[in-house]
Amino acid sequence: MEKFTPSELCADIKIYDYKQKVKYDEKSLVIFEKTGKMIKAGKECEGMLYTLPANSIGFSPIVLGRVSDYTCAEKMLKQMLCRYLGKPVFAGYGEGLIFVHEKLNEVEMKAYFDLLYQAGAKNVVYADESVKGIPEGTPWEDVIWGMKNTYKNLRFAVEITKEQPMDYFKYSLAELAENCKRWGLEEEMSKLYI
């Protein structure tokens, strides 16, 4: 399978601070020392991925909208929320919304609930593109800001998306081609591209 960089595979993360009315753009990227200590998380990793010290590794804990490494995703999200919302008080950050654009199964949804609870959310609300009552053509950013009208106690929201979906498309095709080869279906795969 062709090689994809962590930057191509990583999810884009948007953190909405309802209290300050500010949105922060991040990347699902982390750099860890081989000892397990996280060095950096988010967009600040992008420039370092190609010049990593020998004792460190860079990767994305959220790929194709799914949590691929729970422990790293938890540490990354905690650091991002602390960076933008400040340190959680005794009761945590309050109510948080997780908005994921990919279709998830129940287990994948639970991973996001658990991530937000572990990161300091007191209560978690889940939403995706199947939200009812949204006028067609409404930007998702407006929908997420508007969730505060429905859930009055929301303190923050975390949106998991992909600004360049073509990266996901290329990766998914390469993965499909690899699986077809493994299953002995290369001829059938080639017919799909004709």
Language-model features: where?
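Nucleotide/phosphate-binding catalytic cleft detector across ATP-hydrolyzing
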Residues: M1-D25, F32-K37, C45-I144, T150-I194
